[in-house]
């Protein structure tokens, strides 16, 4: 099944990948992305741990309907969460791109 040194090489690759993934997770935790709604009138910035770092609301919205503003804030947060998820997937996929994985093996991300 594994050629000469194949299992050893696979274990070495797994160790390297684990180290890369840990480093990548630390980098991701430091990332910040901004989601928007209402054509940029509401902006929410979150970090890689999905913690809200900043909320920006255009002053013109403060005079409008409270319910609409709440909806815009929620939509901006959801947009930011979607963006951070996409960024995380892209970065984690780059970790495993150089590995020679067995056919059919899928990474858990």
UniProtKB/Swiss-Prot annotation:
It holds the Pfam family YbaB_DNA_bd. GO terms for molecular function: DNA binding. InterPro entries: YbaB-like_sf (IPR036894), YbaB/EbfC (IPR004401). Keywords: Cytoplasm, DNA-binding. GO terms for cellular component: bacterial nucleoid; cytosol. NCBIfam families: DNA_YbaB_EbfC. Homodimer. Binds to DNA and alters its conformation. May be involved in regulation of gene expression, nucleoid organization and DNA protection. Belongs to the YbaB/EbfC family. This is Nucleoid-associated protein YbaB. It comes from Escherichia coli (strain K12). The lineage of its organism: Bacteria, Pseudomonadati, Pseudomonadota, Gammaproteobacteria, Enterobacterales. The gene is ybaB.
